[in-house]
Regions:
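A short coil-to-beta-strand element that immediately follows conserved catalytic motifs
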Residues: 63-77
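NUDIX/MutT-family hydrolases
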Residues: 100-106, 112-143
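Short secondary-structure boundary/capping segments
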Residues: 4-6, 15, 92-94, 113-115
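Generic C-terminal helix-cap and adjacent flexible tail
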Residues: 148-155
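Conserved N-terminal beta-strand and adjoining loop/helix that marks the start
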Residues: 2-23, 44
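Conserved Nudix-box catalytic region and its N-terminal flanking loop in Nudix hydrolases
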Residues: 18-64
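Short connector loops at helix/strand junctions that flank enzyme active sites
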Residues: 9, 36, 95-99
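Active-site-adjacent beta-strand/loop module that shapes the phosphate/pyrophosphate-binding cleft
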Residues: 75-111
């Protein structure tokens, strides 16, 4: 009986930004590419929002539930083929991942505490420059949608 624990092919992408349209990017330790916070569900019962909150904490040290922060489910999902180099993490019959997009508005740029095993650097960039720096097309597209979410007031 195979007891291998595979990654769940459901993940989040969290665009972290300020009201001034500054976007946080973090550099992956394994590939050296820049991205927003991403990560898979830990278990099937974990909600999209729980995954987003956990991944933000793990990858940046930020508390997405802080009263001055606003986590918003952008109600967008990207479905894409899993890169061949990463397929070994998933069940052999899995080839596609569903990624739910969130935005996390901070009151201003904040210091970041990286998980060194996952990321090596962080930077705040203007939203358009951040989109240009992203390795992932879906990440860049999400960042380019930022102006529409900045016009919506926080609850």
């Amino acid at each position: 009986m195979d007891e291998t624990i595979y990654k769940i092919p459901e993940s989040v992408l969290v665009v972290i930004y300020t009201p001034q349209r500054e976007v946080l990017l973090i550099r992956r330790a394994d590939a050296g590419t820049w991205q927003s916070v991403t990560g898979s569900k830990d278990h099937g019962a974990e909600t999209w929002a729980e995954t987003a909150i956990r991944e933000v904490q793990e990858e940046t040290g930020l508390d997405a539930q802080h009263p001055e922060c606003h986590l918003q489910d952008w109600q967008l999902e990207n479905v894409y083929d899993i890169y061949p180099a990463w397929r070994w993490r998933y069940h052999p019959e899995v080839s596609r991942n569903t990624e739910r997009v969130f935005g996390l508005r901070l009151p201003q740029k904040m210091p970041i505490t990286l998980s060194p095993s996952e990321h090596t650097e962080w930077q705040w960039l203007d939203w358009q420059a951040a989109a240009d720096h992203c390795f992932s097309a879906s990440n860049a597209e999400a960042i380019l949608m930022l102006p529409r979410y900045l016009s919506e007031p926080a609850p």
